[in-house]
């Protein structure tokens, strides 16, 4: 039986039938890794943890990109 995981990313609901990590998610959406801050279930994640954190059912993820300017 295939397990379906539903999670929130920046307030939007997503569903996956595969086990994915935060890094997989970042790569899928094409984010620039050097300009990100990620909140995972209300905790800020270090970029060294992105490949270790597996997205689970009902997780809440916020990805914020840093934009410079003047």
Q: Where do the model's predicted regions map?
A:
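Ubiquitin-like/PB1-type beta-grasp interaction modules and other compact soluble beta-rich domains
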Residues: 1-69
């Amino acid at each position: 039986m295939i397990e379906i995981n539903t999670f929130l990313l920046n307030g939007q609901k997503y569903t996956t039938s595969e086990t994915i990590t935060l890094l997989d998610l970042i790569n899928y959406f094409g984010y620039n890794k050097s300009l990100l801050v990620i909140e995972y279930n209300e905790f800020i994640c270090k970029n060294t943890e992105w490949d270790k954190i597996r997205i689970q059912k009902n997780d809440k993820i916020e990805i914020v990109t840093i934009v410079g300017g003047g």
